[in-house]
């Protein structure tokens, strides 16, 4: 079971805010879509949303998030007048859906956008924007697995027949850390020797077996 960075009660607000941020930056301020994605993933804003910081989940509007992203990464102040829309834009849905998947999977926004280009997401919009969001998550999961092959830790753990939760309990290494090592959200090569030793003892392998080449 994936450990989420924040409670589900905050998810809808976070999704709406990121959707509004994408819509405002791309449609109102005319920032090229791939540029805004690059700004967002490079900014501290994306990391703070991943970590579940309340100020960025419920305390800021989408426009404020877009302004913070662009100011931090380019030094420019966005001051475009917000526009009224009759419905939710394609760009809104993209931000909204990606925010859900980040929460659901605990993967970084950076990793998600390494796999999904804006064009990919545009194409998914036409077939998925009226579907249940879990269908989007399932499709993206498949794409992520195809792109990020199994880590040595996951391969060895699976062969040993041990779940992530069992490995965490027996090794004393947090479940969240094990998940992040397996998803490559944390570099296992930079893990403490003690953590690597504990995991290796449980799985009956060497520390070197766990490291990524």
For each of these PLM feature ranges, what is it?
Residues 26, 157, 168, 200:
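The alpha-helix within a helix-turn-helix
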């Amino acid at each position: 079971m994936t450990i989420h960075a924040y409670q589900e009660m905050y998810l809808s607000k976070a999704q709406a805010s990121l959707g509004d941020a994408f819509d405002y930056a791309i449609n109102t301020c005319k920032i090229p879509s791939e540029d805004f994605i690059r700004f967002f993933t490079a900014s501290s804003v994306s990391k703070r949303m991943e970590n579940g910081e309340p100020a960025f989940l419920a305390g800021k509007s989408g426009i404020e998030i877009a302004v913070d992203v662009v100011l931090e990464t380019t030094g420019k102040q966005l001051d475009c007048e917000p526009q009224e829309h009759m419905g939710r834009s394609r760009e809104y849905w993209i931000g909204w859906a990606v925010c859900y998947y980040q929460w659901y999977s605990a993967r970084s926004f950076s990793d998600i956008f390494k796999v999904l280009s804006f064009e990919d997401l545009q194409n998914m919009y036409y077939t998925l924007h009226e579907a249940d969001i879990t269908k989007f998550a399932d499709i993206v999961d498949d794409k992520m697995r195809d792109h990020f092959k199994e880590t040595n830790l996951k391969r060895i753990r699976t062969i040993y027949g041990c779940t992530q939760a069992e490995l965490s309990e027996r090794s004393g290494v947090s479940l969240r850390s094990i998940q992040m090592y397996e998803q490559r959200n944390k570099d296992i090569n930079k893990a403490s020797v003690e953590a690597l030793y504990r995991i290796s003892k449980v799985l009956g392998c060497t520390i070197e077996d766990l490291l990524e080449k």
